[in-house]
């Protein structure tokens, strides 16, 4: 059965822990072209958008859920918002959990809003990321 409004509220199990490394922070900042010194050194802080790396790992559970019948090649990422409780730092071990907040079905497509809650291994909240995706159903011929 394809994704419907009834799937709102579905919460997936926690993703495998992700250890934020200084090397990944430096690599990410370089990809952004951001030479902020806070993103380098022995104990760098991650750029705020680094949280998208963790969000994408969590979205995999949503996109690969066979019950939802989502085709990744038919998904457009429409919106992204982050709310930080604190910055990400090298050495953080982060657990991410994705929840389907809302599904709107319209004329052969679905708008899906999902939230990824990120916390330290000890349960300290770090960031919440909310994203909206548009998924187009394949038209029967």
Where are these predicted regions, by residue range?
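HotDog/MaoC-like acyl-thioester-processing domains
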Residues: 1-3, 84-141
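Hot-dog-fold acyl-thioester-processing enzymes
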Residues: 1-79, 140
């Amino acid at each position: 059965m394809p994704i419907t409004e009834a799937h709102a509220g579905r919460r997936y199990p926690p993703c495998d822990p992700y250890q934020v490394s200084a090397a990944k922070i430096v690599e990410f900042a370089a990809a952004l072209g951001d030479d902020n010194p806070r993103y380098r050194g022995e104990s760098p802080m991650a750029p705020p958008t680094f949280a998208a790396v963790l969000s994408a790992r969590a979205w995999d559970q949503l996109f690969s859920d066979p019950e939802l019948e989502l085709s990744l090649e038919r998904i457009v990422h429409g919106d992204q918002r982050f709310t930080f409780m604190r910055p990400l730092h090298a050495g953080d071990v982060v657990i991410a959990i994705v929840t389907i907040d809302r599904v709107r079905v319209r004329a052969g497509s679905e708008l899906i809003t999902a939230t990824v809650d990120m916390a330290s291994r000890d349960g300290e909240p770090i960031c919440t990321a909310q994203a909206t995706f548009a998924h187009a159903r394949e038209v029967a011929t």
